[in-house]
């Protein structure tokens, strides 16, 4: 079992502005295991970026305890490392942002090399290291280009190479893909996944997009107004979200909301007959292998008309969603719904015929 490389325990962050007090983060506990790609999702102002900045003490918490790679760096309102020790610890944590923060007058190679300016490596070793990093992020042929000559995705690759220059154990991505188009976003996410596997890198993804969490993360925390409201594996959160905000986020990543809008406009749904029910089914794991709908007809003479279906793979587990119209005698439909509920499915009756 992987050990926690980041432990944030009971973190409070409070800002005082004139006569106003802002509780940006309230009592948040998050443990991130080594090798995780861990998503922290929330809308603007949720406190996610503020929380993550305490990992390397770019933001000092008001209360709480911070442990990074077994070292307690903050506890009981005090830093536990000397300035020199903290500087060394920060080298273990790379960061990338929405804005690439590249130096316009330096080439891609020079931008990456800048991160090694305090390194003990020789000039030749630094040169070799930069070449290796640019190759790692797929920019060997762009090494001598200036930022103005690079696309957004290429600039972010330079930023990633720079963030990896000091061989960090942790990479924090703070909305790093939000300025990129969908295709480039997928490419950057694929690169981060590759780096996670090749380097054993722990990646912390700050985002407001649940699609990114679904595509790359293995665990996720959901924040709202400074509080952590839900946390777990991506599979568990997508299969069985508890909080309304989490459910709203998941809808943006599955397409179910758009499907429901279109389905409810269909005549067959508008004029649903008395012997029918419009039902939404969510299922995961082994349930996807079972002929559930066929069994309903065999057992209850209830037919199923599939209006929408989608299956995705999360953490090597199939997760699916369907919207169906069940038709049959009212008592038989009730029995069928009860059967579905006891088959490890999440069943929501959207409409009954009248």
Swiss-Prot record:
It is a peripheral membrane protein. GO terms for cellular component: plasma membrane. GO terms for molecular function: ABC-type D-methionine transporter activity; ATP binding; ATP hydrolysis activity. It comes from the Bacteria. The keyword Transport applies. It is found in: Cell membrane. Its EC number is 7.4.2.11. It catalyses: L-methionine(out) + ATP + H2O = L-methionine(in) + ADP + phosphate + H(+); D-methionine(out) + ATP + H2O = D-methionine(in) + ADP + phosphate + H(+). PROSITE patterns: ABC_TRANSPORTER_1, ABC_TRANSPORTER_2, METN. Keywords: Amino-acid transport, ATP-binding, Cell membrane, Membrane, Nucleotide-binding, Translocase, Transport. Disulfide bonds: none annotated. ATP binds at residues 42-49. Pfam families: ABC_tran, NIL. Part of the ABC transporter complex MetNIQ involved in methionine import. Responsible for energy coupling to the transport system. This is Methionine import ATP-binding protein MetN. It comes from Streptococcus mutans serotype c (strain ATCC 700610 / UA159). The lineage of its organism: Bacteria, Bacillati, Bacillota, Bacilli, Lactobacillales. The gene is metN.
């Amino acid at each position: 079992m992987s050990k926690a490389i980041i432990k944030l325990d009971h973190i409070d962050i409070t800002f005082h502005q004139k006569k106003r007090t802002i509780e940006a983060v309230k009592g948040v506990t998050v443990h991130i295991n080594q090798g995780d790609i861990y998503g922290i999702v929330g809308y603007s102002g949720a406190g996610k970026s503020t929380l993550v900045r305490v990992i390397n003490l770019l933001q000092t918490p008001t209360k709480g305890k911070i442990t990074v790679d077994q070292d307690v760096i903050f506890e009981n309102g005090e830093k536990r490392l000397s300035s020199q020790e903290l500087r060394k610890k920060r080298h273990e944590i790379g960061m990338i942002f929405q804005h690439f923060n590249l130096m316009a007058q330096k080439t891609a190679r020079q931008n990456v090399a800048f991160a090694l300016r305090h390194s003990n490596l020789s000039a030749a070793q630094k040169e070799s290291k930069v070449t290796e990093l640019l190759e790692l992020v797929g920019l060997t042929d762009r090494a001598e280009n200036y930022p103005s000559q690079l696309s957004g995705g290429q600039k972010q690759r330079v930023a990633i190479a720079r963030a990896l220059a000091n061989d960090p154990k942790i990479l924090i991505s703070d909305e790093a893909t939000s300025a990129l188009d969908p295709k480039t976003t997928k490419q950057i996410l694929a690169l981060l996944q590759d780096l996670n596997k090749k380097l054993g890198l722990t990646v912390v993804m700050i985002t407001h997009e649940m699609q990114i969490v679904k595509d790359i993360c293995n665990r996720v925390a959901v924040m709202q107004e400074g509080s952590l409201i839900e946390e777990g594996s991506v599979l568990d959160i997508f299969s069985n979200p508890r909080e309304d905000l989490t459910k709203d986020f998941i809808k943006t990543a599955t397409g179910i909301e758009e499907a429901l809008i279109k389905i409810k406009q269909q005549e067959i749904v508008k004029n649903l007959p008395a012997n029918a029910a419009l039902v939404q089914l969510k299922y995961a794991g082994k349930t996807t292998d079972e002929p559930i709908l066929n069994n309903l007809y065999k057992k209850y003479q209830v037919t199923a008309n599939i209006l929408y279906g989608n299956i995705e793979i999360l953490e090597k587990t199939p997760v699916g969603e369907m919207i169906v119209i069940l038709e049959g005698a009212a008592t038989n439909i009730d029995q069928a719904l009860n059967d579905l509920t006891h088959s490890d499915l999440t069943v929501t009756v959207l409409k009954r015929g009248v």
